[in-house]
């Protein structure tokens, strides 16, 4: 089991299966045409944008995926809420929106007061980091359907017209800046779990931490860093590096990227040492870079100064005229 597809997650198959849903969903845009909340047809690669006159309401939905299985296995539920909020608010940032509110969806086999209390702690911590309000939610108790629990949410943000980040402003030689991740975040857990847990067990010590600690490290929330960046620097593109790894950059532009990625360390090193090919690593995991900002070359130093106040950030490379993503220091083209 050396690829995500072999672990049971076939992204290409998912894209093919979604075509009918996406096509019919776009057909529903006409139901709001000429009314408040009309969807913006060609804007929004990470989040939908709804037109409210002088501003757009950005909207997105996401969950935690199989990271919840690790939480269940070790009985640690107080950070999983941070992950769910991070997955949503970081996506809102990518269109230039300020996250403002979220509703959560918790599906369980049976309610457990102690577990709910721990999940709530993570939701509160995530909301505080993101500066958002949790304004509602749904708890579904479904013993015939759910074995364990699932946690997801839908978040909204706002962005003024004229300030939407689409990637259209990107040009060759723009600087590509990476903001470091905290680890695996909330993507690639299916492959990591199925590869590592049967071989080592969750209590396996690796570089001073147990395997479950590596896997449950909360996803970083980049709201404060990116909002300050947007206030002070001209930004041409933003990308949350989630499922698909660096392939997420292709959402922004038809231009290409020439990158020098950080050394492979921590949980990524362990996964790679257990047989996952390098190209697959960069297609599945964030590889130490949780968020990317693309800025004009002359703005690079100021951008790095801002972002490094929050998390370690570094110049990854540049935008190129030639399409494709090249990881130069590992000899990989995606």
Swiss-Prot record:
One of its GO terms (cellular component) is cytosol. The keyword Nucleotide-binding applies. Belongs to the AIR synthase family. Its main location: cytoplasm. It is an enzyme of class 6 (ligase). Pfam families: AIRS (PF00586), AIRS_C (PF02769). This is Phosphoribosylformylglycinamidine cyclo-ligase. One of its GO terms (biological process) is adenine biosynthetic process. Keywords: ATP-binding, Cytoplasm, Ligase, Nucleotide-binding, Purine biosynthesis. HAMAP family: AIRS. InterPro entries: PurM-like_C_dom (IPR010918), PurM-like_C_sf (IPR036676), PurM-like_N (IPR016188), PurM-like_N_sf (IPR036921), PurM_cligase (IPR004733). Its EC number is 6.3.3.1. GO terms for molecular function: ATP binding; phosphoribosylamine-glycine ligase activity; phosphoribosylformylglycinamidine cyclo-ligase activity. The keyword Nucleotide-binding applies. It is found in: Cytoplasm. It catalyses: 2-formamido-N(1)-(5-O-phospho-beta-D-ribosyl)acetamidine + ATP = 5-amino-1-(5-phospho-beta-D-ribosyl)imidazole + ADP + phosphate + H(+). It comes from Thermococcus gammatolerans (strain DSM 15229 / JCM 11827 / EJ3).
